[in-house]
C-alpha cells in the first residue's frame, strides 16, 4: 500500500499542507458572493467564510412581510451555498495534488 512512499518526507509534506491551508483560508475569506431573489428585489452578499456582509431589500417589499421573509431566506441560503461551493471547489483544486501516498 505504501511501497513507493518516502516516509522521511512526511514532515515536509505536512509543512507544505499547512502553508497551503493558510493561503487557502486567506484567499477564500477575501471572496464575496452575491445572491438575489424575487427578481433582484432582495440581494444578499456573503464572504468566503459564509458570513453575511450586506442585505439589500427593495422598498416595495416592506409592506408584504410574508413575501419578504420567504425571499430573504432564499437569498441568504443561496449566498451561503455559493460560498460553500466555492470553498469546496478551491480546496479540491488546491489540495488535490497532495496525494503522494502511492495508494
From Swiss-Prot:
GO terms for molecular function: DNA binding. It is found in: Cytoplasm, Nucleoid. Keywords: Cytoplasm, DNA-binding. It holds the Pfam family YbaB_DNA_bd. Gene3D superfamilies: Nucleoid-associated protein YbaB-like domain. Its main location: cytoplasm. The keyword Cytoplasm applies. InterPro entries: YbaB-like_sf, YbaB/EbfC. The keyword Cell cycle does not apply. GO terms for cellular component: bacterial nucleoid; cytosol. HAMAP family: DNA_YbaB_EbfC. PANTHER family: NUCLEOID-ASSOCIATED PROTEIN YBAB (PTHR33449:SF1). Belongs to the YbaB/EbfC family. Homodimer. Binds to DNA and alters its conformation. May be involved in regulation of gene expression, nucleoid organization and DNA protection. This is Nucleoid-associated protein CFF8240_0066. It comes from Campylobacter fetus subsp. fetus (strain 82-40).
Amino acid at each position: 500500500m505504501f511501497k513507493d512512499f518516502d516516509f522521511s518526507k512526511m514532515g515536509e509534506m505536512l509543512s507544505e499542507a499547512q502553508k497551503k491551508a493558510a493561503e487557502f483560508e486567506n484567499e477564500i475569506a477575501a471572496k464575496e458572493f452575491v445572491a438575489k431573489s424575487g427578481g433582484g428585489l432582495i440581494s444578499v452578499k456573503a464572504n468566503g467564510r459564509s458570513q453575511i456582509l450586506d442585505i439589500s431589500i427593495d422598498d416595495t417589499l416592506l409592506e408584504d412581510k410574508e413575501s419578504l421573509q420567504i425571499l430573504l431566506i432564499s437569498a441568504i441560503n443561496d449566498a451561503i451555498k455559493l460560498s460553500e461551493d466555492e470553498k469546496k471547489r478551491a480546496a479540491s483544486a488546491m489540495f488535490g495534488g497532495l496525494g503522494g501516498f502511492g495508494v
